């Protein structure tokens, strides 16, 4: 019953927002994971969005008793836009481990898609008894009148949680695919994305619930 309730709440949460969870995967060998010190990385050229996103997640993790560090606090802003070799990333991982980090949360945009949504639904229209003239007149406005459709953009994103533990290896713990539909403000989108992400991570027992049930402001 508890699981069904959680699913119902999640569906309600998703349907009320412009951020949707499309799919996710959890390492079957890991039932529960607890970050003690986590690096938060948002890969985007939009520095404002990256800063808000990383700061919001940092605050949420800290509210749960986890030490969290933004990539913008540790590296130059150009860190995510410059190519890294496998050797360089290995060195970075070793530095993180030696400084007490045991996990990395990495979010990036993996695709962009332009969409068209028609405002009028023609599925129930009687297709049996109509003439060419009626058919043409009914559908012509779809193509010639912009008021009949909405154009919007979907950003396909991926968030991955990695363990960089000294004893457990450097393994992928969880991966989620989230779609952002036509974002109208950075702050609103960040709030929706982070809230949904945290909800899923809590359900998967990969992050502790809030110590205090209070809204965290940017």
Name each model feature, range by range.
Residues 2-7:
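Sec-dependent signal peptide recognition
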Residues 8, 108-111, 180:
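Residues that line or immediately flank small-molecule/substrate-binding pockets and catalytic motifs
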Residues 12-15:
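C-terminal motif of bacterial Sec signal peptides marking the signal peptidase cleavage site
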Residues 17-34, 134-218:
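C-terminal/domain-edge helix-coil "capping" segments
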Residues 27-53:
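N-terminal export/targeting and maturation segments
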Residues 45-115:
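N-terminal segment of the mature soluble domain
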Residues 87-160:
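Surface-exposed short loop/turn segments
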């Amino acid at each position: 019953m508890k699981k069904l309730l959680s699913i119902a709440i999640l569906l309600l949460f998703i349907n009320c927002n412009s951020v949707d969870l499309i799919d996710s995967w959890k390492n079957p060998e890991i039932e529960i994971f607890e970050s003690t010190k986590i690096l938060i990385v948002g890969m985007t050229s939009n520095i404002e969005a990256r800063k808000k996103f990383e700061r919001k997640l940092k605050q949420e993790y800290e509210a749960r008793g986890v030490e969290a560090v933004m990539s913008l606090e540790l590296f130059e802003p150009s860190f995510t836009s410059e190519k890294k070799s496998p050797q360089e990333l290995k060195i970075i991982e070793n530095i993180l481990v030696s400084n007490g980090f045991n996990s990395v949360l990495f979010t990036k945009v993996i695709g962009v898609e332009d969409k068209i949504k028609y405002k009028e639904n023609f599925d129930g229209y009687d297709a049996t008894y109509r003439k060419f003239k009626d058919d043409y007149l009914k559908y012509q406005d779809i193509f010639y009148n912009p008021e009949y459709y909405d154009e919007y953009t979907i950003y396909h994103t991926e968030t991955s949680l990695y363990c960089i533990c000294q004893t457990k290896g450097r393994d992928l713990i969880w991966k989620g695919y989230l779609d952002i539909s036509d974002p109208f403000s950075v702050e609103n989108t960040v709030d929706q994305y982070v809230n949904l992400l945290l909800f899923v991570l809590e359900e998967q027992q990969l992050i502790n619930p809030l110590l205090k049930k209070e809204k965290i402001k940017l």
